[in-house]
């Protein structure tokens, strides 16, 4: 008889491959003024203060010198720290009317254990916006109107069944 650990592991390997194929990992920090500002201002920023300011430790710098978010361990709390330290105002509270990232999350029905009949609400528990809804005890779905793209659901999913698609940053033309 297979153990519970083996059961969960059986979902991980195919999901990792699918996740990598589905979306590039380029989610920008909150309060962004637009992709062009990242490309023109961030590479010349020497302090990279946005990285040090992030208590969740999810901001990292790409090879091109621009910041991106990594949801593998945590999500964004929209604490404003990165925007408050950005001297070039690429990240600024003035840039956004709402707390929302340029990502829309989705749950893979094939990889999600709740969709396979296992009681699991790992994604719902950390969702501060109550954007993950369950049909009964199973079948979670993400309400796109409520989801801010914070990434906590992705960080907490034991089978890595949550992925995202990149959205255009508001303000970009």
Question: PLM features: residue spans?
Answer:
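Non-ligating segments of multi-cofactor redox enzymes
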Residues: 1-173
């Amino acid at each position: 008889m297979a153990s519970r650990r083996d059961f969960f592991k059986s979902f991980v390997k195919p999901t990792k491959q699918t996740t990598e194929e589905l979306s590039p990992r380029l989610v920008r920090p909150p309060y962004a003024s637009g992709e062009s500002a990242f490309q023109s201002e961030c590479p010349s920023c020497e302090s990279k203060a946005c990285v040090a300011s992030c208590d969740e430790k999810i901001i990292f710098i790409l090879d091109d010198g621009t910041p991106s978010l990594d949801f593998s361990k945590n999500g964004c709390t929209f604490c404003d720290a990165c925007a408050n330290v950005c001297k070039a105002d690429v990240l600024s509270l003035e840039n956004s009317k709402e707390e929302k990232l340029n990502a829309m999350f989705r749950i893979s029905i094939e990889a999600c254990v709740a969709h396979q009949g296992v009681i699991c609400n790992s994604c719902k528990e950390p969702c501060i916006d109550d954007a993950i809804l369950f049909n009964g005890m199973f079948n979670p779905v993400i309400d796109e109107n409520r989801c801010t793209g914070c990434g906590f659901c992705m960080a907490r999913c034991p089978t890595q069944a949550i992925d995202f698609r990149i959205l255009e940053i508001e303000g970009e033309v």
